[in-house]
Amino acid sequence: MKFTLTWRCFALFLLLHQPTPVNPASSNDTHPTVEPEPFLYVIGRKKLMDAQYKCYDRMEQLPPYQGEGPYCNRTWDGWMCWDDTPAGVLGFQYCPDYFPDFDPTEKVTKYCDETGVWFKHPGNNQTWSNYTMCNAFTPEKLQNAYVLYYLAIVGHSLSIFTLVISLGIFKCFRSLGCQRVTLHKNMFLTYILNSMIIIIHLVEVVPNGELVRRDPVSCKVLHFFHQYMMSCNYFWMLCEGIYLHTLIVVAVFAKQQHLRWYYLLGWGFPLVPTTIHAITRAIYFNDNCWMSVETHLLYIIHGPVMAALVVNFFFLLNIVRVLVTKMRETLEAESHMYLKAVKATMILVPLLGIQFVVFPWRPSNKILGKIYDYLMHSLIHFQGFFVATIYCFCNNEVQTTVKRQWVQFKIQWNQRWGRRPAHRSVSRTAASAEEGGIPVYIYHQEPRNDPAHSLGEEGAEIIPLNIIEQESSA
């Protein structure tokens, strides 16, 4: 199962600017007047020759036509094979994939007239099949391509924005610091870098047909880093699963682990399949800018990614089993805390891996296919946003810490720049904050007899509410 939806969107947008012309007035026995990029043209020609060989073999194996009345003989039209067709019938097949801008969901038609003769184009009086819809970029297709293009840009831009905020939160609030947050920050960084690379590719490479034709090394280097960062995304998620599994199942709630092995797995291991893919791609499928997805070499990268997703999912299932057992036996609060962390990871594993499972079953219906495309592009391009939302913004500990800091800031701001609140106001603020479960600090200032210092801040201090409550009870 190929992780190819993103690159198909890129290729479609590029090819909208450089379609392979199919002249309705020309015979299908000739190749397009303007060739696609050289390497893909060679691949397409091999596919064409293979289809021709299979067609002639099929025509020899099929029995003679058994119908009544005139009919058109089986034939090879130069691009596709056509069986015996009754007179007056319009035959059709799906477009071939010889050329990168041909849409396999569109149809080729060939008409057998009433006399049993294949239709001939009036321009040159040669047998003609209608391939015009294969690369006919209608306004609807153009609009769809632009929508997917800008959806990708918006998704990755939003991902970068939310991930940077999340990193800032984890950096500023040291009380959130722990080993698992360190894993979060590394995973966030991979998504930020990956989104930046994709945006560069979308803005600088995809619309630039001349750059793709020149095929500079920098274009392929950019693709290499995209594949590397994409792999890092999933292997850092595997690190999250391994960490929780070791913490809960293996080490029995051990507090510290050696993170160097996680760095090696998250940053180091993805280099292996990515480097192997780059070498084999350069040798066996060296297309321009490595934009084509019509190669099984992509499994070199996507195979380990899929394996990481499967292993991670089984890790998390085992973690849930252990936690449920412990909660039934001991009702430990710590188990509940870890279970929340596991739930967040379990949500992300199928969410971020769904394209590997669902992609092969794209509906053939145009409307359903379009819905599928929008859904899959949303899941793929907004991955960073989902990661930041689930791991940071929806995290109860993060929310509590931010709320606590905000309440402290407002109280200190009011005391420094605003009027001193009455005792009733302070008590009401403390009570409302305490009801929300937020540890609150109040501003306490000893009264002074010296009018000159009545508005000063000397002698003021921030006193936790629990200290005041202890003194009151005493």
Curated annotation (Swiss-Prot):
Function: G protein-coupled receptor activated by ligand peptides amylin (IAPP), calcitonin (CT/CALCA) and calcitonin gene-related peptide type 1 (CGRP1/CALCA). CALCR interacts with receptor-activity-modifying proteins RAMP1, 2 and 3 to form receptor complexes AMYR1, 2 and 3, respectively. IAPP, CT and CGRP1 activate CALCR and AMYRs with distinct modes of receptor activation resulting in specific phenotypes. Ligand binding causes a conformation change that triggers signaling via guanine nucleotide-binding proteins (G proteins) and modulates the activity of downstream effectors.
InterPro entries for the chain: GPCR_2, GPCR_2-like_7TM, GPCR_2_calcitonin_rcpt, GPCR_2_calcitonin_rcpt_fam, GPCR_2_extracell_dom_sf, GPCR_2_extracellular_dom, GPCR_2_secretin-like, GPCR_2_secretin-like_CS
Protein name (Swiss-Prot/TrEMBL): Calcitonin receptor
Cytoplasmic side: 170-181, 243-259, 321-340, 395-474
Regions of this protein lying in the Extracellular compartment: 23-146, 203-219, 281-296, 360-367
Gene: CALCR
Biological processes per GO annotation: adenylate cyclase-activating G protein-coupled receptor signaling pathway; cell surface receptor signaling pathway; positive regulation of cytosolic calcium ion concentration
Family the UniProt entry places it in: Belongs to the G-protein coupled receptor 2 family.
Chief site of localization: membrane
UniProt keyword annotation of Cell membrane present: yes
Keywords, alphabetical: Cell membrane, Disulfide bond, G-protein coupled receptor, Glycoprotein, Membrane, Receptor, Signal, Transducer, Transmembrane, Transmembrane helix
Molecular functions per Gene Ontology: calcitonin binding; calcitonin receptor activity
